[in-house]
Regions:
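Terminal membrane-proximal soluble interaction domains of membrane-associated proteins
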Residues: 1-62
Length: 62
């Protein structure tokens, strides 16, 4: 059981165009983005957790 929650951050392990893989909390999970694409190795933030995947966006530098 993968523990991923809204607000968690991770890093893309493949390009999201708009679907791909993201590493969050040490787990590789299927993710999608509402952006056009996010390249591999980019920090992302979890917006929504669904049954089979998560919705992410680029993490804004603070």
């Amino acid at each position: 059981d993968v523990s991923v929650e809204v607000g968690d951050t991770g890093v893309t392990s493949s390009r999201l165009a708009p679907m791909g893989k993201v590493k969050v909390n040490g787990h590789i999970v299927e993710a999608k983005t509402n952006d056009d694409f996010i390249d591999e190795g980019v920090e992302v933030k979890v917006l929504e957790v669904m049954n089979t995947n998560i919705l992410v966006e680029r993490k804004v530098k603070e």
